[in-house]
Design a protein with these regions (language model features):
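Extracytoplasmic/periplasmic membrane-proximal domains and adjacent transmembrane bundles
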Residues: 1-85, 94, 151, 168, ...
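Helix-loop junctions and hydrophobic alpha-helical segments within the transmembrane domains
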Residues: 64, 71, 75, 151, ...
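Hydrophobic transmembrane alpha-helices and their membrane-interface caps
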Residues: 87-156, 611-694, 699-716, 732, ...
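Transmembrane helices with small-residue packing motifs
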Residues: 122-123, 197-205, 276-312, 366, ...
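Signature of alpha-helical transmembrane segments and their immediate interfacial
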Residues: 176-178, 231, 245-295, 382
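Extracytoplasmic/periplasmic
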Residues: 292-362, 417-450
Length: 766
């Protein structure tokens, strides 16, 4: 062999780069099975690594990213939020009643209800995660509602008639007086989640446990309110103080309310007209909101994807990657980073020209991840020798497309590749000139020159060759072949046979390749094939037998909610012709499907609530009265989303679904009380006193629910962003619907009941 070839030991040419904080690494990724949980798997892996290190002290390893840490931190922040909600709820009860015993009564019902819910969750096979724990936080705010209503009613029956009524009788009578209301309110809250159990897709998978968890909480709280609260009331014998921290404010509000309602009942048309205008205005605000599939929580992780020109030597690529490393390491909020290119690292690019730099920010950083991301984008996307895209990573982003309100994505298809390539290049050129878009790229860009060999099947067949056989022989001559494997000192070493590097390094040398034929002769490659240079993209995608190109970009800070439509009309549409059409992108398609599913669930929930109302009041008229609180809630929901600039997402739509079941509770309390008072009072007096009497329990239940959601509405904790939309929708909706239930609902009650009143009552009201 040594007479005809050079034989030597060597190593394979470097075709990948992997570094952690500037040091070369070998990376191992561990993924859990579907039936395992991250925390258990993480502990097992850590124990295994410690065992290996004990066996070989020279082994050094670093845990680059442990997903279980993110889960643990998210669970911790949600658990802290739940504890805060319980404490604040008890404090609010003390403000209104002035007796710590009253707070303890309601506080006792909370852990009992939570434990019952956890038992039912275990029975259903649910796990504790961000979604289910968030539902427990929401449940804390709602599960005290029934207890507060019962407790407040017990206090009223104790003081009824000016004398002391035996505590036991007051507990029984007080509970019985509001029993129908709390059952109706609980049923309406629960039925809205029935559609969640029936829908499929991502919405059903994610939110079904949330819906069931809240239902479990509400059922447990209802049973607790009917049994535990009156029992504790008799046992503790709390006394409502006349001068509580909130009593003076409540008396002033009730007196002011009576005076205000006297005036509003005389201006029914103005009141109803104003309410309708506000609802219409809220719908206008809704059109100004952005949309996204799911909000990403702040996990402090940024993924930087760097695309280099195809064909670059790995040394040139490494220079670009080192520039990226130097840039991110200058950021004071960076904790560590991992870089991978080629087949190295956790993200294998499989020979493409892309590299991934995953940056992990410090836990005690002074800026949010989005702020760091925007700064890096501004600087890194100016680099001319590569294209850079950045995105923050979310714990919910695993296995799920997270549509973003700032993303641009257009998918064009055509049967003619050349037409599609030309159109995509022109679109990219136009978009790059616009001030409202940046980081524009096409999946057909970064084309690299290559040598293309088109084998003529007829000429090849005449020589006894097939195109496949020609390709195989040319590949072996250009790239070499592994002839055998030697075992040296227990190590397997491949023996590769190849021509010298300069044997076929020009197109002329390729054309001169001589191939053996099946007949024992030979033929030059140029005699059976056309050989020439051609620009080609890294990959060509086809969909339904059509060529496909994806054009992506990012909206700038100056863009608004109408920018996407403008780009569509001003740029994209004019390139759509008979041969080129546009497909709905994956994110938009998924978002539309999930939004449609949740929209149907909301519509079904509204119908189910109406059915429950009709069954409870045995009158469509009273059901319609209660249902008016739902459109009123939209005023606050859309206003809060607009003020915080929170996009409409799956979680915010879930908030609207929950709102359907919660806002009607105040309406139920008011209508039920007004109907009871009409039996003993003048019609006008009954309408006004029903609101004045129910003002305190309405405020208490609304406050406890709202306060429980405030940490989520403020995006508190690592997982705060995930459920912020839901909390904002419910907080805003509850605030406005409570005010509307006290101010507008009495007017609507009079309008709906006016035809059934005798002349004296109508005159008295007007």
């Amino acid at each position: 062999m040594e007479d005809v070839a050079n034989i030597y030991n060597t190593v394979e040419a470097k075709d990948s780069i992997g570094r952690y904080d500037g040091k070369d690494t070998m990376t191992i990724g561990v993924k859990k099975n579907q039936d395992s949980d991250h925390i258990t798997v993480s502990k097992a892996v850590q124990e295994t690594m410690q065992t290996l290190k004990a066996q070989d002290p020279s082994l050094e390893y670093v845990v680059v990213n442990d997903y279980s840490d993110q889960i643990s931190n998210s669970l911790k922040s949600v658990f802290q939020t739940m504890i805060m909600a319980v404490i604040i709820a008890m404090f609010i009860i003390w403000l209104f009643f002035g007796d710590i015993k009253a707070s303890l009564i309601v506080g006792t019902s909370i852990p009992v209800s939570i434990l019952a819910a956890l038992i039912l969750m275990k029975t259903m096979g649910f796990t504790l995660n961000v979604i289910t724990l968030s539902s427990l936080v929401l449940g804390v705010g709602m599960m005290v509602d029934n207890s507060i209503v019962v407790l407040e009613s017990c206090f009223r029956f104790t003081d009824k008639g000016g004398g002391f009524v035996e505590t036991r009788k007051a507990a029984i009578d007080g509970t019985a007086a509001v029993l129908e209301s709390i059952i109706g309110g609980t049923v309406t809250t629960c039925v809205v989640f029935i559609p969640l159990a029936l829908i499929s897709g991502m919405s059903g998978q994610m939110f079904k446990p949330l819906g069931f968890t809240i239902v479990f909480c509400m059922i447990a709280s209802l049973i607790s309110a009917m049994t535990l609260v009156p029992l504790c009331y008799v046992y503790y014998r709390p006394k409502e103080k006349e001068n509580t921290p909130a009593s003076g404010i409540m008396r002033a509000l009730q007196n002011g309310y009576r005076s205000l309602m006297e005036k509003l009942l005389k201006k029914k048309a103005m009141v109803m007209g104003t309410a309708v205008v506000l609802v219409i205005f809220s719908l206008f605000l809704a059109t100004k909101l952005k949309t996204e599939l799911m909000p990403a929580d702040d996990q402090g992780t940024i993924a930087v994807t760097i695309e280099t020109q195809p064909g670059l030597k790995i040394e040139e690529v490494d220079k670009i990657l080192q520039r990226a490393e130097n840039y991110v390491t200058q950021d004071p909020d960076l904790d560590s980073y991992m870089l991978s290119y080629g087949s190295s690292g956790l993200s294998m690019n499989m020979g493409g020209s892309g590299a991934t730099l995953t940056a992990y920010l410090k836990d005690d950083r002074g800026r949010k991840t989005d702020q760091v991301l925007k700064e890096w984008k501004r600087d890194m996307q100016k680099w001319s020798d590569c294209s850079v895209s950045l995105e923050s990573q979310s714990s919910l982003g695993s296995g799920m497309s997270m549509g973003n309100a700032e993303d641009l994505e257009y998918i064009l298809v055509s049967t003619q590749y050349d037409d599609l390539k030309k159109a995509s290049d022109e679109i990219v050129s136009e978009l790059q000139k616009r001030p409202d878009a940046t980081n524009i790229h096409s999946s057909l860009e970064n084309s690299a020159p290559l040598v293309k060999i088109n084998v003529d099947p007829v000429k090849a067949a005449a020589e006894g060759l097939s195109p496949t056989a020609v390709a195989s022989q040319v590949y072996m001559m250009v790239s070499g072949t592994t002839a055998t494997t030697l075992n040296v000192d227990g190590n397997d070493i491949d023996v590769k046979v190849e021509y010298a590097d300069d044997e076929y390094d020009t197109i002329d040398k390729l054309q001169g390749i001589v191939l053996p034929t099946a007949t024992g002769g030979s033929v030059a490659l140029m005699d059976i094939a056309d050989i020439g240079f051609k620009d080609s993209p890294q990959s060509i995608t086809k969909s339904d037998k059509q060529y496909q190109v994806t054009i992506t970009g990012t909206l700038t800070e100056g863009a608004d909610s109408t920018t996407k439509d403008k780009i569509q009309k001003e740029v994209i549409d004019k390139y759509l012709s008979g041969t080129i059409s546009m497909q709905e992108n994956t994110s938009t398609k998924m978002m539309n499907e999930e939004f449609a599913s949740l929209g149907q669930a909301i519509a079904t929930a509204v119908f189910l609530v109406f059915v429950v109302m009709a069954a409870q009041f045995e009158s469509p008229k009273f059901s319609i009265m209660v249902m008016t609180t739902i459109p009123f809630a939209l005023i606050g929901s859309f206003l809060f989303l607009w003020l915080v600039d929170c996009p409409i997402s799956m979680t915010s739509l879930l908030g609207f679904l929950m709102l359907v079941g919660t806002v009607v509770n105040n309406g139920i309390l008011y209508v039920d009380t007004a109907n009871q008072y009409r039996a003993t009072m003048d019609f006008k007096e009954a309408v006004i006193e029903a609101g004045a009497t129910r003002m305190r329990p309405m405020f208490m239940t609304t406050l406890t629910t709202i306060v429980a959601m405030i940490p989520m509405a403020a995006a508190y904790g690592n997982a705060g962003k995930t459920m912020q939309g839901l909390a904002l929708v419910d907080v805003g909706g509850l605030i406005v619907s409570t005010a509307m239930a006290l101010l507008v609902l009495p007017v609507f009650y009079v309008i709906m009941s006016g035809k059934n009143q005798d002349k004296k009552e109508i005159i008295d009201v007007d």
